[in-house]
Amino acid sequence: MKTIFITCFTGLIGRNILSTDAFRLLAERPDLRLIILAPDSRARILREEYAAPNTIVEAVATPALGGMDKFIWVLATNLLPSGTRRVQRRAKLARDRNYFDFVASEVVGFLGRFRFVRWLFRWCASAAGSYGECAPLFERYRPDLLFATDVYAPDDVKLMRLARERGVRAIGMVRSWDNVTSKTLLMMIPDQLVVNTRRIADEAAAYGDVPARIITEVGIPHYDRYRDERLRTPRREFFASVRLRDSRKLILFTPPSDRYLKRDPVPPVVLDTLRDVPAQVLVRMPIVGKADLGDYVPPPNAVFDAPSNSPDFQEVHLSRAADRHLADSIFHSDLVITWASTMIIDAAVFDKPIILIGFDVTSRSYGESILQYYDYDHQRA
């Protein structure tokens, strides 16, 4: 029996991989043993949903980065020579006016343009970085393959480092469309890299120095079930579940969370604009962070949908049922109003008309404006 380690340190991997047919097909093979590596805080809920006779969920301690690991991560973040990182530096300067930090990060970013510097950094990071808490698991299970589902997550990087030392082949994945240009310099190049699209493959080659021969484009696995209309909840049943009338048009509105836009009351402006339209508005609140409406009283044609919420992307969990509800919400909508988020892709999969929020309600600096996010590389054609 072959053993595969699958990382699940980033919360949405449950949606992206574990709930897909790709994972199901692996789990159904009697000649494979799948070991899901997850943080202590989420291991229990993953066991409840995905454990099976040949699928084991192992809890792994994931302490906050410190010491040399923290230094390596900060350096990797600033070495990434992308347009998104330049936007992030400008936005930070607008917020804190720390010119020393801005100039230092600009210098490091300039050095990151040179391939030699990037390769030297990776060599030093591999030599100086830690291996995390998984060494005993390698001894216990002796894996034949590591599938690192987020090659930019610190714990995935540590595991790839450990796998290389143990001679275990590693397949890595770029988890989302913005990761290559917005996270860090790719610290470990796996034996194979899987990506969603040709554009991400090109970015991985340009910014991550990944040889084209080891990159495979696989699409976005969880959209297979989005497009399967047999899995969609019937219209009348769905509308009843969210207290809406199935005879009327539906607008899905997903406001930005306070992780990205603080103290700017965008949702009330949008909802007041929609107050008199001949349609219902389903307001899907963020799954990470909050969208604080204060004492605002929404119009009678608006209904709020509050999915399970988490403080960050490490702790968030989108169960199969919750993901199905999200897909149903988009499928049954006639228009999607959102902002610079992955909801753009989710709505496009269903070929829905999309309106993006591109304004600030109050006058604010670039570093606090919603407009900065539309300057990110992955948002530009």
For the regions a protein language model found, what residue spans apply to each?
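Short N-terminal targeting/anchoring amphipathic segment
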Residues: 5, 91, 135-154, 333-340
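Nucleotide-activated donor-dependent transferases that construct or modify glycoconjugates
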Residues: 1-16, 39-40, 60-63, 252-255
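Active-site-proximal region of nucleotide-activated glycan assembly enzymes
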Residues: 121-125, 129-130, 149, 161-235
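Conserved N-terminal ligand/cofactor-binding loop architecture of enzyme catalytic domains
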Residues: 7, 35-135, 140
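Catalytic binding pocket for nucleotide-activated donors in carbohydrate/polymer assembly enzymes
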Residues: 187-190, 210-212, 342-381
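Donor nucleotide-activated moiety binding/catalytic core segment of transferases
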Residues: 133, 138, 288-345, 349
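Conserved catalytic-core segment of nucleotide-activated headgroup transferases in glycan assembly
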Residues: 18-25, 223-314
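A short alpha->beta transition loop at the rim of the catalytic pocket in nucleotide-sugar-dependent
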Residues: 167, 334, 351-353
